[in-house]
Amino acid sequence: MEGDGPAATAPQYQPVCPTRDACVYNSCYCEENIWKLCEYIKTHNQYLLEECYAVFISNEKKMVPIWKQQARPENGPVIWDYHVVLLHVSREGQSFIYDLDTILPFPCPFDIYIEDALKSDDDIHLQFRRKFRVVRADSYLKHFASDRSHMKDSSGNWREPPPEYPCIETGDSKMNLNDFISMDPAVGWGAVYTLPEFVHRFSSKTYQA
């Protein structure tokens, strides 16, 4: 079945970045990992940046199940408060997801990622249904800021070791991560979608129809 869909065209697809192992990666800092990936694309393939988006996955309860994650590679999902991936929509209409925390291929054809990592809302309780804030990569690079305070416990200790490079900040902000995690369309940057809306907007099958 997979061979009949986007995977069949995958050999013609040119990834926007090097291998997974060559990407900047820090566990539990997915928002920065994707920011760094956007930065790489801007530096090496400026024109491709226009085809890329940072995608925040969360909901009002900040409880979103995602399958096929390295943190739980077996059949069950990981319940994240939020997760961030890169979406590339090529000029040929192929959509690929770059998830540095998945055990699926890197990059992964959009429709395969939806089927295997996100599955369907029909089988998920209402409070766990995912929403997606889709932000253009150039806007993400320009506006995102994090002082990493969300990764410290009440005693000020790191829950996970922070990246060695300096905190990402802008001229206007040192911390606006919550504006990206929020699924309130009136807040922050980009557009907010439900899972069906996200699939309809970016599925490679939609482009082929």
Swiss-Prot record:
Tissue expression: Widely expressed.
Effect caused by changing C23A: Does not strongly affect N-terminal glutamine amidohydrolase activity
UniProt record, GO biological process: protein catabolic process; protein modification process
Catalytic residues of the enzyme: C30, H83, D99
Main location: cytoplasm
MF terms in GO: protein-N-terminal asparagine amidohydrolase activity; protein-N-terminal glutamine amidohydrolase activity
Reactions accelerated catalytically: N-terminal L-glutaminyl-[protein] + H2O = N-terminal L-glutamyl-[protein] + NH4(+)
GO CC term (a single one): nucleus
Keyword Transit peptide in annotation: no
Keywords assigned: Cytoplasm, Hydrolase, Nucleus
Pfam families for the chain: Nt_Gln_amidase (PF09764)
EC number(s) given by UniProt: 3.5.1.122
Entry keyword tRNA processing: no
Compartments where found: Cytoplasm, Cytosol; Nucleus
Subunit details: Monomer.
Function: Mediates the side-chain deamidation of N-terminal glutamine residues to glutamate, an important step in N-end rule pathway of protein degradation. Conversion of the resulting N-terminal glutamine to glutamate renders the protein susceptible to arginylation, polyubiquitination and degradation as specified by the N-end rule. Does not act on substrates with internal or C-terminal glutamine and does not act on non-glutamine residues in any position. Does not deaminate acetylated N-terminal glutamine.
Family: Belongs to the NTAQ1 family.
Name under which the protein is recorded: Protein N-terminal glutamine amidohydrolase
Source organism (scientific name): Mus musculus
